[in-house]
C-alpha cells in the first residue's frame, strides 16, 4: 500500500506484499473471521470508538469538559500509547491493512464537519465586528505565533541537521498550532457556562472567528510550502491556485445557493434534490482543493463560510450533523490517536519541550489578549478570562498537527507533545473560567443583578382601581408538542372575560437541551445580548413547538410571545427563572415530567431530568408556580376557540397560602364565560381544629376563614361547596366525588388537620405535594388533569394582584 499524497499516512503501514482486505465475509460457519474483512471490521471499529469516546465524555461531564477532550483522550487510549501496545489487539481490531478504509471514512467526516464549522461563521457579523474584537484577535494571534516561531527552534526539526526544505513549513505549523483558537469548542464552552450571549462571549466569539479565518489562511500557506516538490515554483502555483479558488467561490457560490434558497420557501420541507446539490458542491470543492495540493477540508470550509445563512443552511445542518458528529468525526480522533505515541516523549529534553510548549501557548495567548483588552478598557478580570477562553484548542488544532505529520513536517515525538498541549490547554479552560467568572455574575451592568437577588419594582395594589390596571403575565414552558393543547386550554381559560383579556399576556418557552450539535450553538447565538432568551416579536427562527403553540393561540384571543431556551438540563431552570423575573410574570406553568397514556390509563416517564427542573424552579422562582399534570385535557373534543370554549374546573381548598393561590387562580379562570368553577372547602371537625392545632396553625386557619369570607362576597362566578370530614377516608371519597371535571386545582403545601393524615404512601413526586400525589396515584382511580400551585411568598407580582380579591398577608 503506497503513501497517499494529500491524504493521511497511516502510523502502522501495511507491507506492500500484503493483499488488500475483501469487503464482506461468507460467515463464521464457512470458517471465515469477520475481523479479516473490511466491512464487518469497520463496523466493529466504529462501535468501539463511539463506546469509548461517549463513556469518557460521560465521566468528564461533571467537570463540564467539552466532548472534544473526551474524544482526543479516547483516540489516544485506542492507539499505541495504551491499548495499541497489546499486539493481539492491534493486529485484530486495528490492523494496518484496514486503516485505508477507516482513514477514508474519517476524512469524509472531517470534510463535512469543516463545512458545518464554516456555516457557524457569519461573514456579515464579521464585517460588523468592532475594532475591539479585531485588536484582541490580532494580539491573541500575533504574539503566540511569534513565540511559536521562537519555540520551534528548540525542536530538532528546525535545526540545521534537519531537512532544510521542511524548516520553513515546520516553523509555520508550530506558529499556527500555538496561536489557533478552536471556534467550535469555544462556542460550546461559552454556551455551557451561559456566557455566549454576554459582552464577554460576543467579544470572544468575534475574535475567535477572525482568528479561525486567519489560521486557515496560514495553514493553507504552510500546506502549500510543505510536501515533496519537484520544482521550487510548485508552492507558488499551489498558493495562487488556492487564491483563485477562493475568489471563484466568493463570486459563484452565494449566487447559486441564494437562487436555490428562494425556490425553497421558509416553513416548507427542503427538496431532496437541492440538498444533494449542496452536498455534492461541498464534495467537489474538497476535490478541487485536494487537486490543487492544499487539502480537501479547506474547500469544504470555504463552502461553509460562503454558504448563505438561513432556513436552507439550517435544513442541511439538521440532515447531516448527527451522522457527522456522532459516527464519522470520532473516527478522525482515532486515526489521530493511532499516530500519537506518548512513549516517544522520553528524557528530560523531551519533557522540557512539552513544558515549554504549554507555557508558550498559555503565556502568549493570555498575555497578548489581556494587554490589548486592557487598552480597550475591558476590566482586568474579564480580560484574563478572555485570554483563557482564547487559549482553547480542539479539533482544528488536531487537524493542523495531523496535516503536519502526514506531510512529514512533524516527527512522532513533536506530534505527541503538541497533542498533549492541546488537551491540557482545553482541559483547564472551563475550571479557570468558573473560578474567575461566575455565570450568575454575567448580566450586563444595566441589567443590575441576577433574578435570585432582584426585588420587583411592581407592587401589588389593594385598591380595586389598581387591580384593574394591572396586567397578568404568565410564562408557559413546553417540553414537546404534546404539551401544546392542554397548555393552550389553560391559557384560554386564564384570559378571563372579554374585558380582562387585553390585560393578559402569555410568554411561551420551549425547553431544549443544549447538545454538541452545531445547530444548538447557532440557535443559542440568536438569543438576546444580556444572556437571557430573546423574546421573539417578529416570529423569526421560532422552534416548531412554539410555532404550533402560536398557531393554536390564533383560535383564541390570547396574546402569545415565544422563545426557545437552549441550555444544559442541569441549568435550564435558570433560564426559566431569569425570564420570569425579567418579564415580571405572576405565574409560571410547567408540564409534569410524565406523559399520560390514555389507552393504558397510566403514566409513562419520558425524560426524568424534567422532574429535577421542576423542583429547581419551585425552589428559585421569582413568582408563583404551577405544575400541570395532563391526563387527557388536550384529548377531549372541546375546541380552544373563544366562542364555544367550555371547561369545568374544581378547586380543592384545605387551607394555607398555596391553596389560597390556587383558589385565586381558579377565580381568574371563572371570569371566562365558558368556565364553570366549583370550590370545595374541606375542613376537619371542630375538635380537631381546636384540640390538635398549634398557635401558628390556628393563625393560618383564621387567615383562611377571613380570605374565604371576603372572596364569597365578591366572587359571583363560583359555586362553593363546604365539606366537613372526620377521617382521611372521607377526604378520599370527597376527592372522588368532585373529580368529574376537566381539571382540578390544588395547592402544593396544603395545610389543615386532615392533610397531615392522608394515606401514607411512597411519595414519588414531592413537587406535587401530599394532595397532588394522592390524586395522581393509583389510590384514586381517576383520569382528571391536575394543576398543582405553589404561591410565591416573596415580594413580587402575584395572581392575587390580577383579580378582584383582597390581599391577605401570609405570616
UniProtKB/Swiss-Prot annotation:
Compartments reported by the entry: Membrane
A single GO molecular function term of this UniProt record: antiporter activity
Annotated tissue distribution: Expressed in leaves and roots.
Record-level GO BP terms: potassium ion transport; proton transmembrane transport; regulation of pH
CC annotations in GO: endoplasmic reticulum; membrane
Topology versus the membrane: Multi-pass membrane protein
Keywords on record: Antiport, Ion transport, Membrane, Potassium, Potassium transport, Transmembrane, Transmembrane helix, Transport
TM stretches of this protein: 33-53, 68-88, 99-119, 136-156, 167-187, 207-227, 233-253, 266-286, 287-307, 315-335, 354-374, 384-404, 415-435
Record Gene3D superfamilies: 1.20.1530.20
Homology family: Belongs to the monovalent cation:proton antiporter 2 (CPA2) transporter (TC 2.A.37) family. CHX (TC 2.A.37.4) subfamily.
Physiological role: May operate as a cation/H(+) antiporter.
The name this protein goes by in its record: Cation/H(+) antiporter 16
Gene name, Swiss-Prot/TrEMBL: CHX16
Amino acid at each position: 500500500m503506497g503513501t497517499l499524497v494529500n491524504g493521511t499516512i497511516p502510523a502502522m503501514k501495511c507491507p506492500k506484499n500484503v493483499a488488500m482486505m475483501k469487503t464482506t465475509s461468507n460467515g463464521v460457519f464457512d470458517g471465515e473471521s469477520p475481523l479479516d474483512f473490511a466491512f464487518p471490521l469497520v463496523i466493529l471499529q466504529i462501535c468501539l470508538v463511539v463506546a469509548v469516546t461517549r463513556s469518557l465524555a460521560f465521566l468528564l461531564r461533571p467537570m463540564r469538559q467539552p466532548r472534544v477532550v473526551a474524544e482526543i483522550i479516547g483516540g489516544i487510549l485506542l492507539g499505541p500509547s495504551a491499548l495499541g501496545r497489546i499486539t493481539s489487539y492491534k493486529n485484530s481490531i486495528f490492523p494496518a491493512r484496514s486503516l485505508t478504509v477507516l482513514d477514508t471514512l474519517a476524512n469524509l467526516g472531517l470534510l463535512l464537519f469543516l463545512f458545518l464549522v464554516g456555516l457557524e461563521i457569519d461573514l456579515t457579523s464579521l464585517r460588523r465586528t468592532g475594532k475591539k474584537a479585531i485588536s484582541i484577535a490580532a494580539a491573541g494571534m500575533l504574539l503566540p505565533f511569534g513565540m511559536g516561531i521562537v519555540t520551534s527552534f528548540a525542536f530538532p526539526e528546525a535545526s540545521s541537521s534537519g531537512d532544510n526544505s521542511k524548516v520553513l513549513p515546520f516553523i509555520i505549523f508550530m506558529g499556527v498550532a500555538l496561536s489557533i483558537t478552536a471556534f467550535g469548542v469555544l462556542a460550546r464552552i461559552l454556551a455551557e457556562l451561559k456566557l455566549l450571549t454576554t459582552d464577554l462571549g460576543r467579544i470572544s466569539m468575534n475574535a475567535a472567528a477572525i482568528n479561525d479565518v486567519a489560521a486557515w489562511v496560514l495553514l493553507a500557506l504552510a500546506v502549500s510550502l510543505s510536501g515533496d516538490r519537484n520544482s521550487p515554483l510548485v508552492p507558488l502555483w499551489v498558493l495562487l491556485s488556492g487564491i483563485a479558488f477562493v475568489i471563484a467561490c466568493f463570486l459563484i457560490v452565494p449566487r447559486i445557493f441564494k437562487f436555490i434558497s428562494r425556490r425553497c420557501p421558509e416553513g416548507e420541507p427542503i427538496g431532496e434534490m437541492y440538498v444533494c446539490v449542496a452536498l455534492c458542491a461541498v464534495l467537489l470543492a474538497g476535490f478541487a482543493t485536494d487537486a490543487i495540493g492544499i487539502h480537501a477540508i479547506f474547500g469544504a470550509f470555504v463552502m461553509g463560510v460562503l454558504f448563505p445563512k438561513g432556513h436552507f443552511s439550517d435544513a442541511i445542518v439538521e440532515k447531516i450533523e448527527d451522522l457527522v458528529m456522532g459516527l464519522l468525526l470520532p473516527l478522525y480522533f482515532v486515526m489521530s490517536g493511532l499516530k500519537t505515541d506518548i512513549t516517544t516523549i522520553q528524557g528530560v529534553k523531551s519533557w522540557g519541550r512539552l513544558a515549554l510548549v504549554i507555557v508558550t501557548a498559555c503565556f502568549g495567548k493570555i498575555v497578548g489578549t489581556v494587554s490589548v483588552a486592557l487598552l480597550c478598557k475591558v476590566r482586568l478580570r474579564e480580560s484574563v478570562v478572555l485570554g483563557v477562553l482564547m487559549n482553547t484548542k480542539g479539533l482544528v488544532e488536531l487537524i493542523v498537527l495531523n496535516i503536519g505529520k502526514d506531510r512529514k513536517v512533524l516527527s512522532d515525538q513533536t506530534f505527541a507533545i503538541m497533542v498533549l498541549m492541546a488537551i491540557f490547554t482545553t482541559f483547564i479552560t472551563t475550571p479557570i473560567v468558573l473560578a474567575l467568572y461566575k455565570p450568575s455574575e454575567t448580566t450586563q451592568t444595566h441589567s443590575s443583578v441576577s433574578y435570585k437577588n432582584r426585588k420587583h419594582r411592581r407592587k401589588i395594589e389593594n385598591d380595586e382601581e389598581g387591580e384593574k390596571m394591572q396586567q397578568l403575565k404568565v410564562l408557559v414552558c413546553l417540553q414537546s408538542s404534546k404539551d401544546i393543547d392542554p397548555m393552550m386550554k389553560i391559557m384560554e381559560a386564564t384570559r378571563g372575560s372579554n374585558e380582562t383579556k387585553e390585560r393578559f399576556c402569555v410568554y411561551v418557552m420551549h425547553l431544549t437541551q443544549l447538545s454538541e450539535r452545531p445547530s444548538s450553538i447557532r440557535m443559542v447565538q440568536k438569543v438576546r445580548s444580556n444572556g437571557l432568551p430573546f423574546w421573539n416579536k417578529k416570529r423569526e427562527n421560532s422552534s416548531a413547538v412554539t410555532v404550533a403553540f402560536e398557531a393554536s393561540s390564533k383560535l383564541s384571543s390570547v396574546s402569545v410571545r415565544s422563545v426557545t431556551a437552549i441550555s444544559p438540563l442541569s441549568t435550564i431552570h435558570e433560564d426559566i427563572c431569569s425570564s420570569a423575573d425579567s418579564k415580571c410574570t405572576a405565574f409560571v406553568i410547567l408540564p409534569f415530567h410524565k406523559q399520560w397514556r390514555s389507552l393504558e390509563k397510566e403514566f409513562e416517564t419520558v425524560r426524568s431530568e424534567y422532574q429535577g427542573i421542576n423542583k429547581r424552579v419551585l425552589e428559585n422562582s421569582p413568582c408563583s408556580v404551577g405544575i400541570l399534570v395532563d391526563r387527557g385535557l388536550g384529548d377531549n373534543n372541546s375546541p380552544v376557540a373563544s366562542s364555544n370554549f367550555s371547561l369545568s374546573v374544581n378547586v380543592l381548598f384545605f387551607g394555607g397560602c398555596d391553596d389560597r393561590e390556587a383558589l385565586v387562580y381558579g377565580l381568574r379562570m371563572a371570569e371566562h364565560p365558558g368556565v364553570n368553577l366549583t370550590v370545595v372547602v374541606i375542613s376537619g371537625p371542630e375538635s380537631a381544629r381546636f384540640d390538635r392545632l398549634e398557635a401558628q396553625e390556628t393563625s393560618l386557619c383564621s387567615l383562611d376563614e377571613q380570605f374565604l369570607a371576603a372572596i364569597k362576597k365578591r366572587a359571583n362566578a363560583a359555586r362553593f361547596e363546604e365539606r366537613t370530614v372526620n377521617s382521611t377516608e372521607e377526604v378520599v371519597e370527597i376527592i372522588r366525588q368532585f373529580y368529574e371535571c376537566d381539571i382540578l386545582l390544588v395547592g402544593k403545601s396544603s395545610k389543615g388537620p386532615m392533610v397531615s393524615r392522608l394515606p401514607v404512601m411512597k411519595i414519588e413526586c414531592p413537587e406535587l405535594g401530599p394532595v397532588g400525589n394522592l390524586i395522581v396515584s393509583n389510590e384514586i382511580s381517576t383520569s382528571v388533569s391536575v394543576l398543582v400551585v405553589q404561591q410565591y411568598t416573596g415580594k413580587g407580582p402575584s395572581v392575587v394582584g390580577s383579580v378582584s380579591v383582597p390581599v391577605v398577608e401570609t405570616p
